[in-house]
């Protein structure tokens, strides 16, 4: 699973998820992409589940690029612990994804296979998604 090798601060503020993605809105590496149409945090487990769903459907054919990385930690207190006495322990890692961001790209497969692979991957993610093609240069 994707996790940072080391971080400067173990506990981060949650932050705001306003507006669109600044960059990464086009298909850069592959022929087809999976674009988020809503904003959310995506955990490293959800990214891995989507990747497995895509690669299994494509039967190891083609190439997959993951264009998001879970660099933000989130914390949680243990069950049954009262409020107060500091922030909880780091629980996991998330990638903040804003609307418009292309999260996955594929190349080397037909459009029908790519569409179905992205449909299966979209069911594993907490955001609404759409299929996008690379723009002709």
UniProtKB/Swiss-Prot annotation:
InterPro entries: Ribosomal_uL16 (IPR047873), Ribosomal_uL16_bact-type (IPR000114), Ribosomal_uL16_CS (IPR020798), Ribosomal_uL16_dom (IPR016180), Ribosomal_uL16_sf (IPR036920). It holds the Pfam family Ribosomal_L16. One of its GO terms (molecular function) is tRNA binding. Belongs to the universal ribosomal protein uL16 family. Binds 23S rRNA and is also seen to make contacts with the A and possibly P site tRNAs. NCBIfam families: rplP_bact. This is Large ribosomal subunit protein uL16. It comes from Streptococcus suis (strain 05ZYH33). The lineage of its organism: Bacteria, Bacillati, Bacillota, Bacilli, Lactobacillales. The gene is rplP.
């Amino acid at each position: 699973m994707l996790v940072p090798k080391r971080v400067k601060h173990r506990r981060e503020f949650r932050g705001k998820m306003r507006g669109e993605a600044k960059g990464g809105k086009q298909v850069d590496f592959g022929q087809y992409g999976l674009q988020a149409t809503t904003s959310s945090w995506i955990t490293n487990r959800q990214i891995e589940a989507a990747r497995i769903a895509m690669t299994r459907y494509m039967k190891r054919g083609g190439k997959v690029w993951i264009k998001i990385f879970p660099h933000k930690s989130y914390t949680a207190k243990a069950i049954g612990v009262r409020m107060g006495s500091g922030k909880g322990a780091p629980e996991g890692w998330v990638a903040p994804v804003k609307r418009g961001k292309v999260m996955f790209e594929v190349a080397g497969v037909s459009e029908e296979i790519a569409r179905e692979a992205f449909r299966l991957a979209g069911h594993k993610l907490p955001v609404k998604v759409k299929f996008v093609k690379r723009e002709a240069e």
